[in-house]
Amino acid sequence: AEIWAEDLPAETTLLQKLASTFALVDPRAAELVALCAGPRDALIAPSMPWLMDSSVDPFEAHNLRLLYGRWLVHEAMYDESLVYLASLEPKDVVAPATLLFFQGVAYHALVEKEKGLAVLRRLLDGAEQSPRRYAAVARLMQEDLDGVEPDTLHHIARRMDDIHRRLDLGRAGPKVRGIEDGVIDSLDKLIKRLEDQQQQQSGGGGGGIQSGAP
């Protein structure tokens, strides 16, 4: 009862208080809440398969998945966060704007343009019900993703940032190598385009020179 003694809080506080309520009766929830209360102390995110177990009450599982996914985003573990967040819908949780915001942050960080823009549009469509800071940051992420075009310097730079983040987390497997291969392919395409443009400009300039010989 003490947890709920205050007036109805904002949705982010509501999520935290709901999680604390689950923790009073479920030791697994208590462990998760304790984990999410501090920074990570390992490069590998703890697996929480029980959150995806259909035998767990959906109301508890969905909201704790949001709590855990939000924490994973804060820890820059974006792929891991989407394991828990991607399939959730706003109607599944007590903090719908928080869900859409952190889905958007993860997709933005991973440069998944279409998925990112889709969830950010949904968040901004209900901006009047969302925390102002969510709406403000969502507009910035939307503008950034709108400007991402395949094989441009912006796109290449964003993916290189993602590679550095993954390496900082100790990730060096097939996923990272695949992103690295994609960056190299994009660089090759960009260089080829620039070379073609230079050749066209040189050819156009050369074609306009008239010989002075009789």
What is the meaning of each model-derived region?
Residues 1-214:
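Mature extracytoplasmic or organellar-lumen-exposed domains after removal of signal/transit peptides
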